[in-house]
Amino acid sequence: MKRQADRSGTVVAVRGGIVDARFDGEMPALHSLLLAGAQDEIVVEVMLHLDGGHVRGNALTPTQGLACGDTIKDSGAPLQAPVGQAILGRVFNVFGQPIDRREPPDGCRWRSVLTKPAGLTERSSKTEMFITGIKAIDVLAPLERGGKAGLFGGAGVGKTVLITELIHNMVGQHEGVSLFCGIGERCREGEELFREMREAGVLDNTVMVFGQMNEPPGARFRVGLTALTMAEYFRDDQGRDVLLLIDNIFRFIQAGMEISGLLGLMPSRLGYQPTMGTELAELQERISSTRHAAITSIQAVYVPADDFTDPAAVHTFSHLSASIVLSRRRASEGLYPAIDPLASTSNILNPRIVGERHYRLAQEIRRTLATYEELKDIIAMLGLEELSREDRRIVFRARRLERFLTQPFHTTQQFTGMQGRTVALDAALNGCEAILNDEFSEAPEKILYMIGGLEEARQRLREEETAGHGEEPP
């Protein structure tokens, strides 16, 4: 990355990741990068213009070794990202520097990460479904091609597992480019994901960008824009569809909160930055479909203390076309993926887009599961026998639907010992319809647990009947 450093200033204050500098001549522009250190290894982004020729910047690298009186140079350019065919199959940091122990890619161009979203006249209004191969998502909360989907959940309910399974299912069948952006997540998870994708042979059409949790908040705050700049190149310049996976949007908001506090801005509710809505919109509005191609985004969103009224979750909800909510209660019951079928929603679940049969089945499933939730208190107090015959049938259907919507994942196969399943939409709909029609009312619930399609359930039932007939009487 080439930078022209011709204007110099002096460091006057260093407070953690915040650096104040004085420029006697021309002031550096907002968002311009300042370089300090013997080898320009300390990078600071200008965030505020103060009075008297002073600027305040946010460090994108650790500031160890920086002292008052040191020289700091204006690069004359904002943060930039490499774009081009050569970035495929590589792993980068926020500066576009490779972190996969290989030489920098050749023939790349550099673009500013601070670009405007596509104009309204450039955007596509076409709506179509994006198949994931996961039953609970495709049936009850289908994703939109060129839309934004959020995976909401607290700590330990399976957000990262679900997003890695989505990568596994979609990267192989996805004809465009897949781009994974890790914001403030564990280095170990990124390394495991890189290794899995390389072994699966899908790394050649994938780009990975990381701003890890041990990096300064400035790097975590900007790494999403670096990834988006790369995604926009493939969408606009090459006309290729892009699958953008982000883990975790909450860490982006959290990094902005840290920067806001260090800059001395007045906090808003629960300590969040007053500009949270604007900052999130700047990121989310660049994820869109145009007449050239589409960027489809799936984003993990950590929900602090499982509180869905938290401002970070509330602000994120409004940008999404599908919200997939993960439930701690379902996870504790062993119903994986722990997707809450009643809380999860999708804007495209209407008969004009998904078809009359899909819409009707999804509504019937929700109605059955909602009635079961209402009956749980009565069952706990009085027992199942006190329910009417029709209510008992609803309970039996709901329990079988809950188990059928579970699914073994390829990415957890080494832990569970169960072969992963990718289920076609028709197979998922046929299974739900059969259960709603009481086809499995006499069968044990366990044959529907952790399977793909109904053929597996029928095979299990035949095996149980064979085993039962083969037993000798006592």
UniProtKB/Swiss-Prot annotation:
Bilayer disposition of the protein: Peripheral membrane protein
PROSITE patterns: ATPASE_ALPHA_BETA
Subcellular location: Cell inner membrane
EC number, UniProt record: 7.1.2.2
Disulphide linkage map: none
Alphabetized GO MF terms: ATP binding; ATP hydrolysis activity; proton-transporting ATP synthase activity, rotational mechanism; proton-transporting ATPase activity, rotational mechanism
Pfam family, one: ATP-synt_ab
PANTHER family assigned: ATP SYNTHASE, ATP SYNTHASE SUBUNIT BETA, MITOCHONDRIAL
Entry's family note: Belongs to the ATPase alpha/beta chains family.
Subunit (UniProt): F-type ATPases have 2 components, CF(1) - the catalytic core - and CF(0) - the membrane proton channel. CF(1) has five subunits: alpha(3), beta(3), gamma(1), delta(1), epsilon(1). CF(0) has three main subunits: a(1), b(2) and c(9-12). The alpha and beta chains form an alternating ring which encloses part of the gamma chain. CF(1) is attached to CF(0) by a central stalk formed by the gamma and epsilon chains, while a peripheral stalk is formed by the delta and b chains.
Name under which the protein is recorded: ATP synthase subunit beta 2
Organism: Syntrophotalea carbinolica (strain DSM 2380 / NBRC 103641 / GraBd1) (Pelobacter carbinolicus)
Gene expressing this chain: atpD2
